[in-house]
Amino acid sequence: MRPDGPRDPVAGPDSGPEPPYPVRLSGPVIKGFGRGSKELGIPTANIPAEGLEEYPDLQVGVYYGVVALDPAKFQYQEGQGSTSTSSTGGAEAAVLPAVLSIGYNPFYKNKTKSIEIHIMPPLSSPSPTADGAGEVKFHKLPDFYGTQLKLLILGYIRPEYDYVSLEALIEDIRVDCEVARKSLQRPAYACYIDGDEKECSDVVREQRRWLVTF
């Protein structure tokens, strides 16, 4: 069960990701258990868990990072709060913040390990999961099954927990989203999103180049 007590507002050092992060994972978006949107109201993009074989020491739990989707199949319409699919080539992939779980989800007692990624709106947009924001509506995108997704995991938030109720699980995921947002807003992490040539190190630029190249 989740321990009682307040949550830390950020995760990871302010100076930026430390080994083993960033962790690179990629794959086509596949169908998951079908619970994210329908039961929890929290849409997720699942990718095959086989990529975890490269990282045998990566523990199960909740993480934060950044994602990009193949722009030949999916384009984020920045500034409109919506998304669309497209087959037009030449567009650059949008880099978006994400919170994700790797593991078995003890509340549902899954038998197989999964990677479930919730893609959040740009950090410049109002947070739909902020405390006191009214009714929580997690960020939703149109379906994009089969689209290639790339993920850089930048930090670890917490272990997996079981919960006394579905509502308690949803509330902890809401807090996960806020921890991820606040963590990614720090300059050493924001570079992975905005790619500022003046502020980013060569290492960050190389990681970001991998992220947006399809």
UniProtKB/Swiss-Prot annotation:
SMART domains: Flavokinase (SM00904). Pathway: Cofactor biosynthesis; FMN biosynthesis; FMN from riboflavin (ATP route): step 1/1. One of its GO terms (biological process) is riboflavin biosynthetic process. It catalyses: riboflavin + ATP = FMN + ADP + H(+). Mg(2+) binds at residues 44, 46. Its EC number is 2.7.1.26. It comes from the Eukaryota. Its cofactor is Zn(2+); Mg(2+). This is Riboflavin kinase. The lineage of its organism: Eukaryota, Fungi, Dikarya, Ascomycota, Pezizomycotina.
